[in-house]
Amino acid sequence: LFFNLQFCCGLFFAEFLAPLTGGDSWDNGNTGVVRAILDPQSPQHALYQQWLDRLADFALNLKGADGNLVPFIFRPYHEHTQEWPWWGSKCTTEQEFIDFWRMTVRYLRDTRGVHNLIYAISPQMDSEYSDARGRLSFRWPGDEWVDFIGMDCYHGLNTAAFTSNLKALTQFSREKLKPCGVTETGQESFTKADYWTQCILAPLTTQRVSMVVMWRNKYVSDESDKHYYSV
């Protein structure tokens, strides 16, 4: 599987998972994956284009009962501020990431004519930052290459961090004239009884965001009572 598909709030979300090394998203041992994909003469470029073709075919066949195409939010390279992914700050230069993002959008949107993808960028913002706007604009591909501005915010019980980052997000959204939302958040296992009302809802009511999405629930045999974020 080369991308992960989730459904929430009437929208589909998609993100790439498997790098060309054969590992998963966390396989950052090879820092030249993106560089290889960007080389039009490389076998990695040809393979990645095949992946994009498969995604394009999927998107163009995703239709509702009325026959209309179903839109879904596509955030292929989420948390690009972090070092863990093969597309992240450890494995790419600023220009490589920007070129990679634009290459992806250009091929899907302009070459394949896919227009039901909503391209979302989503830096990770867990703490309070002296330059939150700079984190939101980190390796910004350009206004014409992004449709939706998100942030992944695992603030735990630090409501002040969530509040300040939401404020920065909505300000950046207004500046760019693009919708915004929280593309990942939550606390593992919910240790606070009023977590939903005080740590999530209260900060959200002060800002205008389009959505908030919790991270997954996953059954793990040795910690089945721990890894859940959504209920």
Feature locations, PLM:
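Structural preference for beta-strand elements that scaffold enzyme active sites
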Residues: 9-13, 69-75, 116-120, 145-150, ...
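Substrate-binding cleft of extracellular glycoside hydrolase catalytic domains
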Residues: 2-114, 215
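Aromatic-lined carbohydrate-recognition surfaces of secreted/lumenal glycan-active proteins
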Residues: 75-77, 101-134, 178-190, 214
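Substrate-binding cleft of secreted/luminal carbohydrate-active enzymes
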Residues: 178-231
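Acidic (Asp/Glu)-rich catalytic clusters
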Residues: 2-8, 58-68, 138-144, 169-175, ...
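Solvent-exposed loop/turn segments at secondary-structure junctions
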Residues: 19-20, 78-82, 124-129, 153-158, ...
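Amphipathic, non-transmembrane alpha-helical secondary structure
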Residues: 49-60, 98, 102, 160-171, ...
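Glycoside hydrolase catalytic-domain groove-lining segments
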Residues: 8, 133-135, 139-191, 227-231
